[in-house]
Each structure stands twice: as C-alpha cells, then as structure tokens.
Amino acid sequence: ANLVSVITAILSLALSLYLVRSIRALHRKVNRNADRVSKELSGQTGRIKSELADVYHQFEAIEQLLPLLKLSAPLPPSRGWAASPDFLLTLAHVTKSIRPRFTVELGSGTSTLVLAKSGARKIISLDHSPEFGSQTREMLAAHKVRGVEILIHELESYPSGYKWYAKSTLKGLAKIDLLIIDGPPSSTNPDARYPALEHLVPLLSPKATVILDDVYRDEERKLADAIVKALPNHVLT
C-alpha cells in the first residue's frame, strides 16, 4: 500500500509538473500571438488612417478644383486609371499660372479637359488606347471644348527596347511650353515613360514646365532625376 501511495504521489507530481510546463508554454504562445495580433492591428490601423487622410486630401482637392473649371457638364470619375483630384488641381494651377501656348500630354483623359478649361491654348494628347482616346473626345465634345487634338495610335517598338508612342504622332512637335508625362501605363513596362526624356525633352521651349505623375514609383523618380539633370533651368513638378 505504501508503494502504491508513493507511486501515486510521484505520478501526481509528474503530472502537475507537466501541466505547469504546458500551461507556461501555452501562456508564452498566447503572448507571442497576442503581440503578433497587436502588431497586425497596429499596422492595419496605420494603413486605415493613411487611406482616410488620402481620401480627405482628395476631397479637398476636388472641392478646390471644381470652382476653377466652370464646367458645363459632369466631370468624369477620377482615381483608378484616371488622374487623381490632387494631380488635376496641380494641372489647373500650373496651367493658369504659365498660360502655355502649346501643351503636349502623354495619356488623355480628365486631365485633358482640365488643361483645356484652365486656359491651355493648343493641346496635343497622345494615347495608345482607342477606348480611352475615344472617351476623351466624347467628353471634350460634351463640354464644348475646342483646340485639342487627340492622337490615337498603338504603342510602337523602339530600338532601345521600349514600347512607346508611335513616331508618326511626334511629327511637328516643337517649342512645347507644358509637357505632361502620365503615360504609357507602367503595365506595359516599368520604365514605360522613360523615352520621353529622349524624344520630347529636347523639344521643350526655353521656359517650359514639365509635370510628371506617379512620382511615388521608383521608375518615375528615376525619370524625374534624369530630366532635372538634362534641364537644370526648367521646372519639374
């Protein structure tokens, strides 16, 4: 009986030690998971705050933009493939400030309308998409805008390996006062907009302004730096 009692006591002690260790291990695991969940929640909260701040920023931009344009028809939706309100507001402010005689835009859309409504005199917009180019033409017609030429042609392969706007659409371009680089889309090539440096920057007028969209991307920042080096006396926005 004494032996049984001793064995029972030993087993009970072993079981107790096992349970204590298991509980401690579980506690550590719970703490690790809690830390991970806390970090994930903190990250999500930060992203949500950032997105809300951007939404508010874009709302402020569209509120400031609309009174500047005096539109006679609805403004198409922005964001997504279309230009963001803050970018459109920049276009409006710059155009009203410098009053360009000749504007070249890479990638047509709502931005084309904003340029025209802000006082750009002659605008040529290059677009590789028949769908988007046609939509822009219809939008301009709805707003009774004139003096804008939408040149639609699929992207063309260049010796450098890039696919860019067709050479035929570049004929006659010279003394560009305002250059908007917002195409081709990066889906065609991460450096899809880089050929503008070679083919359009040399065609700028002495006091031209260059506006480059999507500069949060590495490729666009690289292009911006290259343009700054090529044109130290020009303005890059």
Where are each of the predicted segments found?
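Conserved SAM-binding loop of SAM-dependent methyltransferases across substrates and taxa
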Residues: 110-120
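S-adenosyl-L-methionine
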Residues: 137-175
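Class I SAM-dependent methyltransferase Rossmann-like catalytic core
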Residues: 62-98
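Conserved SAM-binding motif I beta-strand of class I
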Residues: 122-128
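C-terminal substrate-binding/active-site "lid" region of AdoMet-derived donor-dependent transferases
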Residues: 154, 185-237
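Conserved class I S-adenosyl-L-methionine
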Residues: 98-109
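Single-pass membrane-anchoring alpha-helices
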Residues: 1-28
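Short alpha-helix immediately C-terminal to the canonical SAM-binding loop
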Residues: 133-134
